[in-house]
UniProtKB/Swiss-Prot annotation:
Protein name: Ocellatin-LB1
Similarity comment: family membership: Belongs to the frog skin active peptide (FSAP) family. Ocellatin subfamily.
Coiled-coil regions listed in the entry: none
Membrane-traversing stretches: none
The organism's place on the tree of life at top rank: Eukaryota
Positions where Methionine amide occurs in the chain: 22
Signal peptide: none
Tissue expression notes: Expressed by the skin glands.
Subcellular location(s) per record: Secreted
Length: 22
């Protein structure tokens, strides 16, 4: 559903931010 898509996008964004910081 839409919530799952939003959760997936949030995880994807968080992963990109984490990789930039590390």
């Amino acid at each position: 559903g839409v919530v799952d898509i939003l959760k997936g996008a949030a995880k994807d964004i968080a992963g990109h931010l984490a990789s930039k910081v590390m």
